[in-house]
Amino acid sequence: MGKRFSGVSQTMSRFRGWIQAGATLLTNLHLPNFLKGGLYQGAGKTVCVPGLNCYSCPAASGACPIGAFQAVVGSSRFSFSYYITGFLILLGVLLGRFICGFLCPFGWFQELLHKLPTKKLSTKKLKPLTYLKYAVLLVIVFLLPAFLVNDVGMGDPFFCKYLCPQGVLEGAIPLSLANSGIRAALGKLFTWKFSILLAVIVLSVLFYRPFCKWLCPLGAFYALFNRVSLFQMKVDKSKCVSCGRCARACKMDVDVTKTPNHTECIRCGMCIRACPTNAVCFRYGFGSGKEKENAATLRENNKA
């Protein structure tokens, strides 16, 4: 049975930045490796972390799920891919895009950039771009590594190699700064990916989490489970006064009263803090039929 916890919801949303910082630290525990210019290669690297965090980051405690998935898809052996796929499905069912909002290091990085005091631009008219990330997931993460293979049947990790800005931020830059050999070997591919990183940085200052909205394949995968995950948004129709504050507060362009578990909702809790009547909160568990009926009634009332 689902549980509503308004007090917990308020606390989680209020301290979300600290939770993001803690999650980033836990994902990157081996900080001395930044000075050494080496990678942690212990048992932790056989386990995937939930967010987008590069395997090649000197401090990384675990493997990136997208990188690990591509590694097995691009090989002739698929015994390990079942573990990775099952791991991602489990996280999707348990948490959905809560991972994006609370546990992803690169999502937090974009949010910090967006806090810089400059003019901000809305993404509401750019909603069609949100479908790009599903194409990235299907084509670049899965199809290209699986079917564009060399003579020995190995495919490249196309997303990691050609598109992922996190790999440059966490991997290439710190490793090249600490290692002259790596620095001397940097070429056109590094220039290309560094340009992507710069573009994401600039866009993140102007737009809220642009990479998450438009290009992140991990976010696309978790989004597929947002409507069925155990961690969901709950709107109490008896408390809602249809003021629209929650929709205006949402930087992911979601109206929680109409679609409380929209694929773009990252469970950041901004709507919870904006609601003047405490009608919105997190809910964890399986919803009852009455709750679903109330949600449907609320959507109908908002249309009226």
Predicted regions: what is each one?
Residues 1-257, 263-304:
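Non-ligating segments of multi-cofactor redox enzymes
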